[in-house]
């Protein structure tokens, strides 16, 4: 469960840093939000703080801290703009790696992370 939370955090961090190709709106900086992490039949609430740092014209590195009632997780990763307001990439927490899909709209991001262990869905807002 913690790996999924970490992966989600990482994804969110990467997306916030990237610049939208079409709208040229920067998502770089700090974001905060919440959502759910699912692993099998277990579903937990998660809260995340994400920081995006631009690494190239269309990509960013992310660093995140996410918490659930079961613990605190640090997540890192990378995301790339794949067109318009959509981003994809990977995040890592501990030994777990996940795939990130993010949609950016104004001051909000919808992030989905999937891994062999489960998935996470988080909504982030600019801090």
Where are these regions (language model features)?
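Positively charged n-region of N-terminal signal peptides that target proteins for export
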Residues: 1-4
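Bacterial N-terminal signal peptides
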Residues: 6-18
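Signal peptide processing junction and immediate N-terminal pro/mature segment
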Residues: 21-22
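Central antiparallel beta-sheet cores of small beta-barrel/beta-sandwich binding domains
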Residues: 25-127
């Amino acid at each position: 469960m913690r790996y999924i939370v970490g992966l989600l955090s990482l994804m969110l961090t990467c997306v916030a840093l990237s610049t939208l190709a079409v709208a040229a709106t920067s998502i770089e900086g700090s974001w905060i939000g919440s959502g759910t992490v699912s692993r099998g039949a277990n579903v937990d609430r998660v809260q995340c703080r994400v920081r995006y740092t631009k690494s190239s014209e269309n990509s960013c590195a992310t660093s995140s801290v996410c918490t659930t009632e079961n613990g605190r997780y640090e997540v890192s990763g990378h995301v790339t703009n794949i067109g318009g307001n959509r981003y994809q990439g990977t995040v890592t927490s501990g030994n777990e790696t996940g795939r990130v899909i993010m949609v950016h709209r104004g001051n909000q991001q919808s992030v989905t992370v999937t891994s062999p262990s489960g998935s996470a869905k988080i909504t982030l807002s600019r801090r």
